Amino acid sequence: MTDELFREDASLVECTATIVAVDEAGVVLDRTVFYPLGGGQAGDAGTLTAEGGAQLQIVDTRKHPTQPGEIVHIPPAGAFLGGFTVGTKLVARIDAVRRRAHMRFHTATHLLCALIPHPVDGCSITASYARLDFHMNEPLDKEQISAGIARLVKDARPVSHRWISEAELDANPALVRSMRVQPPRSESGLGRVRVLEIEGADLQPCGGTHVANTAEVGAVIVTKIEKKSAMTRRVVLGFAEPAEGRG
């Protein structure tokens, strides 16, 4: 089982690790800072650098398709893996700019949930945009929601996480905002669920990476609102600052 360092500290950009498996799915490490695709958030990219200096690009990160609890680091198709075998010690480093964008957008989607009190019917978080689909038929105002996000960002509210028991979650079903995806239950068998809290604004199960304070979300605005169906309104978020100003 991969030790998921990002669960407790999303600000980590690198760690030392040892390869425990290499198969058709990718490279598996004993520990990692790479977040795998999940909860609507894209997987991390970055590099693995072996002790001898060999470097392997990682273009995506996923949960292992057949080994529960393991994370696979996916190299480009056809990449040479000669220097990366079981037992190789290395430094795993994520693309920090890409991760930071994921963290800002993911926290911003929780601010959306605070502003739009309806169930979530879909989610996607990338380095260039984020979107949430809300189960509702009422119209939404783009400028009003952008202003609400800006207000919560300006409030500089602390963002934290904690673990609750699965029994506690089951006793409080209103914590779950997603209609289609169930909260990530612990694969360790400990029977616990990770909960994200934005002080005074949002509290819900979430396994993603987030900033530590809403002020760090920065200039995020609503770029589009779409009526996807009679009961679905899609809200798309984007950065208001130029790409070179991010990091």
Name each region found by the language model.
Residues 1-247:
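Active-/binding-site microenvironments in catalytic and ligand-binding cores
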